[in-house]
Amino acid sequence: MNALPIRTAAPSGHSGGHSSTGTHVPVLLNEVLETLSPAPGGVFLDGTFGGGGYTRAILDTAEDSTVWAVDRDPAAITRGEALAARYRGRLHLIQGNFSQMASLLTDRGVNALDGIVLDIGVSSFQIDDPDRGFSFRTDGPLDMRMAGEGTSAADLIARLPEAEIANILYELGEERKSRQIARAIVSARAEEPITTTGRLASIIRCVVPPDRSGIDPATRSFQALRIAVNDELGELERALQQATNLLQPGGRLVIVSFHSLEDRIVKRFMNDAAGNAPSPSRYDPRGLVARTEPRFRLITSKAVRPGTAEQNANPRSRSARLRAIECLRRETTP
């Protein structure tokens, strides 16, 4: 296939940037297209539609292809309506979680796919909108809800005990000073509710001094709260199993993740699906059970990372990792 050239992107998004014309440019665009290898007439799922960059590239690359685009954020679906009008009959927008992709698609008569792409995490549009409450760089309401419903980050830190806040920061943000930050949050909320991103970031920065990396001290804590608010790791694990059951032989699952927690889940799942899981001990009774032939093969032996040019153009792409598998056969039902 002919991969599209990557356009220069401004550093304005976690999972993508914007060109000088305002077009959304997703991270690892060339690499995603090359790995997905969309064929003419194929049916694909963009499970994290966002700004529509991957969807647009698939539709432009593969003649007569169809994309079903899912996003939990109503704003993303609204933005996508103009794109759907442009690709009349080829792009179908669905508001919902990618962890529900099986039911969302089967309810619409789609039972098999030629490819799936997932860009895990917060989108550039969400980060760059202060009112969504994802960023510590601009002051706004402490929200972080991707779908705009459920428990907000402000609600979370207002009601959770100190120990639970510390656990979230440590387990989901890998923040070493999680206990000190949790203690500072509980102390601050006793004086006044923490309702803005600016105040929370200030509290964290008073506990965690800046280091030589140049990474803002609030980065890990904000990541942890966002993951907790949106149950991102749970959503990912549920989505992976459904994705593999939807792919037909030759279909590929391509995933771009942005931090080590996600990448570990994806790597482990893909290795297991491809039959590359470590052999059990000969003393483990489970090892006596005959292994079935794997239904998938690894496309990426190791994670694909953005090149220097893309990292320089969009610094937020630096942590991106791409992994992919290809379906060899569909699961047969007895």
Swiss-Prot record:
InterPro entries: RsmH, SAM-dep_MeTrfase_MraW_recog, SAM-dependent_MTases_sf
Name of the top EC class for this enzyme: transferase
Signal sequence segment: none
Source taxon at top rank: Bacteria
Reactions accelerated catalytically: cytidine(1402) in 16S rRNA + S-adenosyl-L-methionine = N(4)-methylcytidine(1402) in 16S rRNA + S-adenosyl-L-homocysteine + H(+)
Enzyme Commission number(s) from the entry: 2.1.1.199
One GO-annotated biological process of the protein: rRNA base methylation
Pfam family, one: Methyltransf_5
Binding positions for S-adenosyl-L-methionine per the UniProt entry: G52, G53, Y54, D71, F98, D119, Q126
Keywords: Cytoplasm, Methyltransferase, rRNA processing, S-adenosyl-L-methionine, Transferase
GO cellular component: cytoplasm
GO molecular function, one term: rRNA (cytosine-N4-)-methyltransferase activity
Localization per Swiss-Prot or TrEMBL: Cytoplasm
Region span, Disordered: 1-21
Function description: Specifically methylates the N4 position of cytidine in position 1402 (C1402) of 16S rRNA.
Family: Belongs to the methyltransferase superfamily. RsmH family.
Protein name: Ribosomal RNA small subunit methyltransferase H
